[in-house]
Amino acid sequence: MNIAKFCIRHKVTTLLAVIMIAVFGVVYTTQLQMALLPNIEYPAAYVYCYYNGAGPEDIEQLVTRPLESAIMSVPGVDSVTSSSADSISTIQIMYVENTDVDIAATKLREKFDALSLPDGCGSPVILNINVSEMMPSAIVGLLGDDLAALQQQAENVVAPALERIDGVASVSVSGGVERQITVTLDAQRAAGYGLSTSYITQILQAENLLYPAGEVYNGSQKLSVTTDAQLSTVDEVANINIPLQTGGTVRLGEVANVAFETSDRDAIAAMDGTPGIILQVSKRSGANEVKTAEAVVAAMEELAAKDGSIHYAIPYVASEYINVAVDAALEGIILGVVLAALVVWLFLRRGGATMTIAVSMPVCILAVFVLMYVCDLTLNMMSLGGIAMGVGMIVDNSIIVLENIYRWASEGHDRMTSCIEGTKEVTLSLTASTLTTVAVFLPLGLTGGIAGQIFKDFCLTIAFLILGSLAVAVTLVPLLCYFLLDESKVHLDALQRAQKGGRRTQKLMDWYVKKLDYYVHHLKRGVLVSVALVAVFLAACLNTKMVLLPEMDEGMVTVTVSMPIGSKVEQAAAMAERVAAIAEETIPELAGYYYTADSGQSASLVLNLTDKGERDRSATDIANALRDATYDVAGCEITCSAYDMGAMMGGSGVSVNITGEDYTTLKMIADDLTAQIAAIPGAVDVSSTVAEQVPQVKVTADRQACSQYGLTAYSVAAAVRSGLTGTTATTVTIDNKEVDVVVRGDGRAEESLDALRSMAISTPTGGSVPLGSIADVSVVMSPQTITRYNQSRQVTISGDAADGDTSAMAKSIRAILAGYTLPGGYTAELAGGYTEMMENFSDLGLALIVSVGLVYFVLASQFESFVMPVIIMMILPIAFAGALFALPLTGKDLSMISLVSLIMLAGTVVNASIVLVDYIKQRRDRGETREEAILHACPLRIRPVLMTTLTTILALVPTALGMTGKMNEMMSDMGTTMIAGMLVSTVITLLFTPVYYCVIDDLTHRRERRKAKKLAAAQSEP
């Protein structure tokens, strides 16, 4: 069936269908969810388990090892990496590809429930990783000096209000202090009564309860019975009578100081030097991030208006960045449409033709929005980037149909014939070129790992665009031409242009025909020239560095301050303030900062910079300058880097994992390799997870001595823990908020080792005994942190390259590892962001190979020939080499984005060759010789080839130059490589595709002649 003929004869039906698609497109565009990134589910999870007061070795033995054993028994687990530090075990789980992390988490909980972890150890917390949800929708800072009041304000007012917002999943609070009822025992008085912290803890638990007792009948009515003995005030806690072993009781307040006070600070936060509390708001999966972030801002404004005591600042809100990205993409799309219409006007000089293109492109784009809504895609950087990248491509099909219709009209054919036959003549080549372009996105969309998830939306939107462009080209374009085409005027204008403009264009056409004729008759030289071009282009790309994703200047610099073991949280916060002061002095582009110190061992500082257009330096340059400025700061380790999205998806540095059992040997190997890696030119932030041996007090109970006093090793350990750390005995509800009741010693035992040895340990008989009499109290050396990989101890060395060239750094590290002799049973291998990058590059390389194979399959099916696709695809090596040549020329790096552009080129640059070769074949079928067909067909196909190439290139120029905002920092590499590849391929197509055609044709005929000779010889034999 002739589609163009059907559409022209059913004008009303066709127009109503187009209008309906446009209306649905406008409606669904407003209903699409908006997000910064596609939903990226990383097949990984974290497990956290807290055991306050336990050292790294105790955590490893009592918590980490049992958890690891349980985790390794869950199906789908690929690897387990753990870190055992003071009071906490952190375990990272990597699943095999396509594992359902939610089901895996359920199985993990079942395994954990069956474990017997130590008393006082918290329940393991499982956190599945979703990259898009790791970035907060908003960060809110509550400011003020009274941190306890701020904590209550955050927990009772602000956080609940924000959590009620539709789309908010959670609100985390850090930097405040909790209120608690503290029961501090007087050691001497308690010992005089024979009281211990553990005994008082038991009494408090027994005296504070709400206990169901059963049911009674009141006549015919059945009533439930509850024993209510809940504590509700500090005085009630202080007035509890403690039974004595010798008989009688003593009031708790007589042997302990009972007070309502703030807990010890375990986190400190500040914003621009003002103390406060940081609230991080995370969106729910599938929620509209822009609406969620804007609702957070509106909610804070409403809360501040109602309560004048709420003082806040919002240093980060995702909607601002997303709106900029969306606006940038829409600007690029509109600019692409305008430029495409301009190209049509310049070549055809017809208002009707320009109007046809100007109408067909928006219809195609609106149709894509309908399909995005149906497929549940979001408006994110990748989907919008796909539309922006595809704007220049979608007009190609329409231009070829339009140009061919006008060519038929210029030759004197009537309007109906021109529209129907002009469309029919190019339908086969259009279908082939469209299918080849779509085919390359199939393996890309099915690629595993992060690359596949990142580019899935990108691939789908471009595939929708290109398929839609084919439908529009063979339906709407001929119909609009039928309405707008004046065939007699087109024919007359063609004759006039031939007379007036012939002299202006004839010289260029004569030059082209002369070169074409030369290469067609000197095939070897043509092949040598094309091979030389490939060699030159590839040689220029040898020093191009590789990165996972292009650098995106998001206007933030992150600083991590690592403190020595034993440091207090106040010391970490003070060091963060010092670094912030240095930043204020040395960074004029600084707009503000905030930091959080979550423990005494580290603090995280985030510097917000002014807008990119207002500064001369990039965020990376500023981070490097700050690294130099803080180099001499003593007492801590400081790392500075620009906030990078790529780091969230695997990092950008290089790591070396060293595994073995003996920690001393691991430390020796790590120290040697760390020194050698740090000496690599350009290596920065080189460090290892080797924890310095730090002093630790070890209490070893003497079981025989303990038994003489009726004590056990456990009762001694519990008494020491309660005296030093304190024990949460129970909770009391005050002002509708649960408050912990913590029983602890008076702090004297913490003052020195002698004081610890003198700690009175209560005995079951009512007396007490010094700790030193029943246990050995000594100082031993222990590692600060113990890291394990797949149940073996591991040390990791990590570093980065100052210029970002991790591939060169990895090459140097490989040389170091090759020359290093490891003891038996120990291994050292590359890991980190570099290996993640290479895995993704490998996946994309495989996708490129599969894409080329699919292009061949589609072309072979369309032309029913094994040879024709080879001729057309001879353009690919030169296009790839030319595209890569543009990277060092423009100072860009080879990234995943660049490789994706090569895959796109595999399906786009062949389009011009398809049009050219198909028309050469048609003319040969009409009886022309090979050379005649080439010299007649190529000049006639210059105009559509140049028009499609120019529209695609011009539509990509804003993206390549980053003219439309921050989003194009990521897509700029793709635009650059696409433009270079298309420029090179267009020139080569017009000059050398006929050469390849002749070479393959000669080889085919030569093979046929040999077969004929063999057949004739066989038949002539008697």
Kindly label every feature range from the protein language model.
Residues 1-34, 424-426, 497-550, 607, ...:
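Signature of alpha-helical transmembrane segments and their immediate interfacial
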Residues 318, 384, 632-1004, 1022:
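C-terminal transmembrane helical bundles of large multi-pass transporters
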Residues 530-629, 633, 637-640:
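Juxtamembrane segments of multi-pass membrane proteins
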Residues 12, 19-55, 113-120, 165, ...:
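Transmembrane helices with small-residue packing motifs
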Residues 1-334, 453, 655, 737, ...:
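Membrane-proximal extracytoplasmic
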